[in-house]
Each structure stands twice: as structure tokens, then as C-alpha cells.
Amino acid sequence: LLQIITGDATKGQNLIHHPCIADVHITGSIASHDRIVWGDDPRAQATQKLRGEPLLAKPITSELGNVSPWLIVPGRYTTRELESQAEHIAASITNNASFNCLATRVIVTWSGWPQRDLFLRTVERFLRQTPNRVAYYPGAADRYCRFAGRDGSLEPGQTFPWTLLSAQSIRERPELFTEESFACVCAETCLDSPTPEMFVQEAVSFANDCLAGTLCASITIPRDFQRNHPSGVRAALRDLRYTSLCVNQWSGLAYSLVSPPWGGYPGATLDNAGSGMGAVHNTYLLDRFEKSILTGPLVNYPRPVWFPSHRNALSTARHFIALYQKPSALRLPSLFWAALRG
């Protein structure tokens, strides 16, 4: 039985506590989770957590927020590689007007990387080329002003500019790293590591220890680094505490595949839920999983349909939906042709 009910927070609260409801799953923020489990008042939440007495006496699973990082391993990238990875990041920021838990919120680079400035300018160019979207999500105007550091008020329903804040420090702007903005704001921070090899280790530690969330992360790795430092690459992928890791790709791809598990990294508890407990998707019903790793090329062909620059995205999407409605090998040629024309 599936019944879809719409309404406000009060109706949601009534449904959660209804005697006919045995289990609860939510998608939202950690703040929403804690209000449901521990109560509305922050002081009462702390007391209930200390006592170990949740107000919700039902099992709950969750998929919560994430300050999703994209780590850029320094190297000598070709122009095509640099542009492709920059557009990947721009697409991850602009998709769904940036109202995604997997939107890139922090780009981590090496201060000694010669191509750093060029790369950031390329990301900004792709952002400028993407039309601004209506900030439809409740509270987006206030959050945008706060995280973008803009004074003044913005009206709900306005279009806000895609905003990349370069060279940000966690000491000066901790909110950019420890809170999910859920607005079209992305911060870039650079680490002063002595070598590229040390940067990879320190970037992994920075993502694990300084950024909020464990849901998903992406890392761009040049081919020469993978060839010359295979053990360093394996260690980085092993040590990153994220359930979904994507190499050279946006983590939205792992989400859209549906088969990999999607949720917070193992170890979350009811009083420290992080990016959530439990998982969705997981088509193969894997048990006791830790993470999934998806790898891809530095340059995708054909052009990903989620890139704003894709010239035939709408037609490709329609062919894709038609394939899902009536699966048939006869529908594949038209889908491939639409995608190739992007």
C-alpha cells in the first residue's frame, strides 16, 4: 500500500507518531532528524540525548545532508581534461538549482598547483554560461545571503547568481565547511602541503575531519599521478569516509545508477546521525557495505546529459523515459542518437 500525503510540518509530525506507522524514513537535514527524534527545543534535545531517551519510540532510518567535497589532485591536465572536469563541477553546482544534498559545496585544491587559477576561472566561466534558476526552496534567500556573504535581503522566488568563493579558510568562514548551505554557493579552499603526494593525504584528512557529512565525495586524479602513485591513490580511496566515492565524475552519477547503496557512512548513531543511518537504492541488497567507488575518464564521451551545455538534453531525457515506460532494444538507437547529438 502506497499513500502519498502532502502537508506542513504539523501534518508530518502527526503521521510520524500515528499508531499505524511502524517505521520512519526521512530525507532532510540533521536538524529535521533531531527535531523528530529528540524534540523541538535544543536544550531538551541535549537532555534527551544525555539520558538516551528519544521521543520517537519507533525505528528510524535517514538520508541527511552533506557538505559534498570535490578534491582536485594536482597534475598536468590537458585543456580538454581541465575543461571537462570544470564543467563536471559546474554541473554539480547548478543541477536542480543547487538544491541537492550531493551538490558540490567545497572544492579542495593544492596551493602549489600551477593550473589552479586557470581551473577556477574555467569553473566560473561555465557557471556564468548557465542561466540562473529560480530559488524555489523555502529559506533559500536567507541562506544564500548568509553563505555568500551578501548584505541586504533577497525575495523568495528570485534567481540568485551561481557563486564560487575562492581561497576560503575554515577558520574565517567555518559555516561554509560545517553546515550544508542548500543554496547555490560553493567554496574553494587550498591546502599548503609540501608536495602533491602529501596534499592527497592531507586533503583526505581535511574532508574526513573538517567537513560535515559522509554521504558522497568526488576526486579528480590525473593519469600521471595514478600511474606514478598507485598506492597513494588506493590509500586515498580506502581512507575517505564517504559511502559513495566518484573518481573524475560527479557523485550524482552513482546516485542515478540506483544499484549502489546510498546513505551515510557506517557508524552513525541516533544521537549523532551525521549523513544518516541506513541506506536506500542498493538494488543488489548488499549487506554490511562500507562504500561504493565509481571511476570514469577525465573526459566523457558522449557529453553527459546533465551538463548544462548539452545541446539535446530534453530529447535525450524523453527517449530515456520512453525506454523505461516500455523497455525494448528497438528504442536504444534513438536514445543513443539523441545523446550523441549533445
Locations of regions flagged by a protein language model:
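C-terminal core of ALDH-fold dehydrogenases
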Residues: 200-311
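PLP-dependent aminotransferase-like
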Residues: 1-10
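Conserved glycine-rich beta-strand-loop-beta hairpin in the small C-terminal domain of fold type I
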Residues: 156-165, 174-188, 210-216, 244
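Short hydrophobic/charged patches on amphipathic alpha-helices used for structural packing
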Residues: 12-13, 204
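Short, well-ordered beta-strand elements within core beta-sheets of diverse protein domains
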Residues: 71-72, 105-111, 182-195, 214-222
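ALDH superfamily catalytic-core signature
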Residues: 17-23, 31-172, 197, 247, ...
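Residue-level signal for inorganic ion chemistry
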Residues: 2, 24, 66, 110, ...
